[in-house]
């Protein structure tokens, strides 16, 4: 019973860390990264579809993304979707592929991106803390229902706290790495 509660809390915390990694991957850091376009949805026969499901997205150079659609007819739609996105990127097409040159980030934009990254990291820290709170509530309920002794619950709560601290540290490391990547000129 207690082990299940601990395992469930840890799984939620793992999901929060993975979610943060995905979120931060989509933040532009001055380098071309195919993950930038993961959230760009293209209207493909009336259905919003991610770019990476319609084309091969590659990064042959540090500041260049190349999108090679499997269906050439969708090329203009992909261009429109990229222009509409909040990425601030301008695609150029030659009829077969779309090239996106990633411009250098200004110092002001870098600091804005760092703020966004910190905000996202805090959101995911809150998720980890919520998982801790839920686990502690379940542990207290199991103590109240006489399913576990007070000592067992205390030990389990300490484990939950250690796990929480561990995942918060992981989030902080991920954030520090992303901040360094963003501030890199």
Curated annotation (Swiss-Prot):
<dbReference type="Pfam" id="PF01765">
    <property type="entry name" value="RRF"/>
</dbReference>
<dbReference type="InterPro" id="IPR002661">
    <property type="entry name" value="Ribosome_recyc_fac"/>
</dbReference>
<protein>
    <recommendedName>
        <fullName>Ribosome-recycling factor</fullName>
    </recommendedName>
</protein>
<keyword id="KW-0648">Protein biosynthesis</keyword>
<dbReference type="GO" id="GO:0006415">
    <property type="term" value="P:translational termination"/>
</dbReference>
<comment type="function">
    <text>Responsible for the release of ribosomes from messenger RNA at the termination of protein biosynthesis. May increase the efficiency of translation by recycling ribosomes from one round of translation to another.</text>
</comment>
<dbReference type="InterPro" id="IPR023584">
    <property type="entry name" value="Ribosome_recyc_fac_dom"/>
</dbReference>
<comment type="similarity">
    <text>Belongs to the RRF family.</text>
</comment>
<dbReference type="GO" id="GO:0043023">
    <property type="term" value="F:ribosomal large subunit binding"/>
</dbReference>
<dbReference type="GO" id="GO:0005737">
    <property type="term" value="C:cytoplasm"/>
</dbReference>
<keyword id="KW-0963">Cytoplasm</keyword>
<dbReference type="InterPro" id="IPR036191">
    <property type="entry name" value="RRF_sf"/>
</dbReference>
<feature type="region of interest" description="Disordered">
    <location>
        <begin position="135"/>
        <end position="159"/>
    </location>
</feature>
């Amino acid at each position: 019973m207690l082990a299940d509660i601990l395992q469930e809390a840890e799984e939620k915390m793992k999901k929060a860390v993975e979610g943060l990694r995905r979120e931060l991957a989509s933040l532009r850091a001055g380098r071309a990264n195919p993950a930038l376009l993961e959230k760009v949805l293209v209207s493909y026969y009336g259905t919003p579809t991610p770019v990476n499901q319609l084309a091969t997205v590659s990064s042959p150079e540090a500041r260049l993304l190349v999108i090679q659609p499997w269906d050439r007819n969708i090329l203009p739609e992909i261009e429109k979707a990229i222009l509409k996105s909040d990425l601030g990127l301008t695609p150029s097409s030659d009829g077969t592929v779309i090239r996106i040159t990633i411009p250098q980030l200004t110092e002001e934009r870098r600091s804005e991106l760092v703020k966004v990254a910190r905000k996202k990291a805090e959101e995911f820290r809150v998720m980890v803390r919520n998982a801790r709170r839920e686990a502690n509530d379940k542990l207290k309920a199991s103590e109240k229902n006489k399913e576990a002794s007070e000592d067992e619950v205390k030990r389990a709560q300490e484990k939950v706290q250690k796990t929480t601290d561990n995942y918060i540290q992981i989030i902080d490391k991920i954030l520090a790495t992303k901040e360094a990547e963003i501030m890199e000129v």
